[in-house]
Structures are given as structure tokens and as C-alpha cells.
Amino acid sequence: MMFNSYEKGPYFDEMFRSDEGDTFSHYSTVLNRLDQWPPSKLLEKQQKIDSSFLEQGVTFTVTGDTVHGTERIFPFDLIPRIIPDAEWQKIEQGLSQRIIALNLFLNDIYHGGKIIADGIIPEDVVKSAAHYRPEMVGVDVPKDIYIHICGSDLIRDGDGNYLVLEDNGRCPSGVSYLLENREAMKRAVPGMYRALGVRPVDDYADLLRKTLEFLSPRQAQSPVCVVLTPGLYNSAYFEHSFLARQMGIEIVEGRDLVAIDGYVYMRTTRGLVQVDVIYRRIDDDFLDPQVFREDSMLGVPGLMDAYLKGNVALANAVGTGVADDKVTYAYVPDMIRYYLAQEPIIDNVPTYLGWREGDRRYILEHLEELVVKAANESGGYGMLMGPSSTKEERVEFAQRIEAEPRNYVAQPVVSLSRHPTICGDHIEGRHVDLRPFVLYGEDIEIIPGGLTRVALTKGSLVVNSSQGGGSKDTWVLYQ
């Protein structure tokens, strides 16, 4: 009876309606099964999963951790998060709406900027974004799609409402952990998995490959697609190699490719093979030393020439980072209204913008109450958690905001929903978010569920793996 001492606390709890044990109906089967197991059985299953992840190399890299080392398994919790069908349908609709609007925005700002001319978003906000690429002005990308793979992060507030926390439209990561989590759960709790009627996720690699092939500039029967990785020491290398293997395509580094006369080729033992589509897991800055950073050893000299001539496709497109910008994020609801004449299905978290004088004054006067974020940082870096910050940290961030107001946003602290999580020999609530993965090719495909990330440190709201977070399997139920 590991749940007997469980406390819901003053948060929205994914499993329990109240401290008295009133359970949401879609969790009743899981709770009944788990409650029948002695703690030793639950812990044994958890340990088997941890061991299998270690054996399979399901790891990520933490930069600068000299105490525990850089390579570690991605922490996983056995108790699944469950999303009923009706709830998931709304999430799907909201994410589809959002990725369409973001792609229309990117196409617009690189082709005349009507949304700017109509006063919806200031020109300076767009063109001062760190990842705005003037090289892409007037360039037509394949199928007019810029973001082919997206991972928008969702949270739930104290009333259980879903909110978009941020958009990841450059190189969203984490889907390999989602897929590995599912396989681990099917082995660990097969009876429970079958009993609930969980929607599968194992066609993701096929859908991703079809999305990439759809972008091919050549009308070849089998377009040549590759995954371009920075290499073995990148924090997400496990994912790069995993996805290439699952799709049945080559994983390459920049040195494995060569650009000749406006085309890109892969070096093989059989000679050069023309490449049609590159799923790049490298930021724009490092793609081509002839166009972006001259010191890049990760990219391919001449790649941008081939790309701009339409002879090779890149997923995601160059210049999508404008949509990743946390200042741009604040305007996405307006984009939805402007391009689609619809109200947002999933709302944003209220956001204060440092470049607006009134907002900046409010931010500086309420640093203790707010979460402050740098516009282009990720992974929990460049962030001030006001309620847990020191006076010195607040002074430092105030100085940063004054020096670079365009580069900072602030949001009220949203008490993320909590989910029962195994903590040693008992169960406690831990805060969670959700990263669903959206593919935009011939159709929009959203993988049922997503990666539920868990803040494993008690009381923490930071779920990022780089900051010690873990994950859960996410079960979307059939109707």
C-alpha cells in the first residue's frame, strides 16, 4: 500500500482529485494494480528498467559535471502518466493549430513580412532575434514548410488547464527516450499496458522518415536521407544514432559530406552518393563555415549554396530559430488570430517582455515572484527562479535585464501539476511537464503522448534532464 501516505498537496495532481484518495477514473486500473504490489516488487521492476537502460546506452551527457561524470542514464520512473482520449484530442487540435501558425509566420517574415506591416509584431523584435537569418529572405523552402519536427512544451496550471510553456522548433530532442520508455514499460508491466488500451507510439520512425522523404527535391523513388550529428560527444548523440537506426538511414558528421557544384554528396565505400534530405541536429551557426561561423568544424562548406539552390532539403529549415525565441513566443496567440482567424486552443503562460518599458519596470519590481528567462537559452540555463533566488542573483539579473532588455522575458510562477513518483521505498508527488512531438510533412502527425519530464528534486519546478530531471512513459488511451 505504497499510496497510503501519499499527499496531493496544494497542486493539481494528475492521479488524485483529493488527499482522501479520490482518483481520476482513467487512473483507477493503474492504481489498483500498483496498490496490490508490495514495495519490493515495484522497486525490483524499477531497478530492472534502470539496468536495461544502462546496458542499452540510453544516456545523455551533462556538461561540466566533474563529480558524477558526463555520461549517465536518463532517470526513468515506472508509474505512467495517463491522458484520456478526450483530453488528448484537444491537445492534438491545439498543437496542429500552433505549428500551422508558426510555419505561416516564418514564411511571412522571410517573404515580405505582412504581419510586421500590419503591426501585429514589431519588426525589431523579429530582426533582432538571435536566430533570424537574413540569408533566408526571399528563399522558398521545400513545400513552404519550415518546422518539420516540433516539440512544444506543455504544462498544467493549478486548475488542470494545459498551457504552452515554450516552442522548440530548431532541433527538439527527447523522442528517443519516449520510444525507449515505452518499450521498457511493455516489458515491465505487460498486463497493465494491455488492460488499459494504450495507443502505440512505435510508428514514429516510419512517420519521421516519410516526413523527410516528402521534402526531397528529387522525385526519386527512394530519396537519400541522412541524420547530421555534431558527433559522439554531443549530449543528444544517443538520440541521433537511435533515430538513424530506427529509420534505416545513415548517421553522418560534417566530414562525411561534401558539396560539389551546388549538390551535396555522402562519402561511401562505393564512392559519392547524392543526398536529398538532411535531418540536421546541428544549429544554423555551425552548418556551413562559408556562410555562418568560419570556425565551425561540424558543418559542410558549400551546404548553404546547395540548399539555397533547392538541391538539398534541410529539416528543420534554416532560420526557424526565430520561432524558438522566447520573445516571439509571446506573440504566437496573435499569430493564430492573424493567420487562422481562430482563438488559440491552448493558451500561453502570461509573459512580460523586457523590451517594453512598462513590462520591464514590473519585472524589476517583482523579481522575487517571477521566473525570468533569457530569450534564447534552453535546458534550464539562463533562468532565474524568483521565489528561490538569492538577493545577489536578483541583482545580477536586474543588471542583465537593464543591459539587454530585448533578451529577457518573465512569467508568473506556474505551479506545474504533480504526478506520483517512486522516491526510494515510497511514493511522493513530483512536478511534471509534457513534450509532445509533432511532424509536419504531407500531413500533420502527432505522436500519442509525448515525453513526460519529471522534476526529481523535491519541490523543484525544473524538469530538464540537464538540471537533474527524469521522465515517465505517457499513455494516451483509446476512446
Language model features with spans:
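Preference for protein termini
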Residues: M1-Q479
